[in-house]
Amino acid sequence: MRLVNLILLLIALVFFVWVLNELGWDTLGHYLWEVGWYWPLLLLPYGVVNAVVSWAWKHIIINPPAKVTVARLFWLRLGGDALNQLTPTASLGGEPFKAVRLQADGVPLEVASASVVIMKGILFLSLTLYIFTGLALAPVFLPQTAKHMLLLSLAALGLAAVGIAFVALQRRGPCGNSFRFLSRRGWLPHFLRDREGFLEDLDTAMSQFYRQYPARAVMSFLLFFLSWLIHAAEVYVIFWLLGC
């Protein structure tokens, strides 16, 4: 496993250097010079955002082992998000990694997998609230956007509907129902044929979370929303330091 981690680290380093080279070392140096010697402070907001999201994730995992701390989730999320960025999987490539590493830390796989799916759903819902907040403030700070407000609001409502449907679906046994639907029609992939029990347990874990721990769901939602606000502050500070 250490060898695999080292290989992945080297690949990530090569990609990182390539990206910087594409941006242009002179251009990068120019912007860093404009910001000043305290430019490393610009990296802090992302760390704060990741810490808040990890805290929210901790609320989703029921009865985690002692070793599953916010700090541990912080690094797991960084690793998973790195895989999301490096693989063409629509930001889903790192999610199995998070679940498997949680299982290695003592969390049952169905609980770990449920936490990842639930986190995606609640994070998406918090994003829609963040978008609606931006739309509410847009006429005040960007009056020129008023003529597009109807279209933007309809798009935001569409996103909210998708998010609500995704979260509501998690309470209705989507994995088991999909398994039986595919099985009846002979479309069930071979690798899923022995996984019905796990899928049923995954459905149970997701449903129980929403039914038995609504306060945890609300707390994680609020923390996710806070993380989006910190993101906004981060962008504002960067542009302010660059004199934009």
Language-model regions: role of each:
Residues 27-35, 66-69, 105-106, 205-213:
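Helix-boundary and loop/linker segments of multi-pass membrane transporters
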Residues 52-79, 238-244:
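Membrane-embedded helical hairpins/re-entrant loop segments and their flanking transmembrane helices
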Residues 184-202:
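Short, membrane-interfacial amphipathic segments enriched in basic
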Residues 44, 48, 79, 118-125, ...:
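Hydrophobic residues within alpha-helical transmembrane segments
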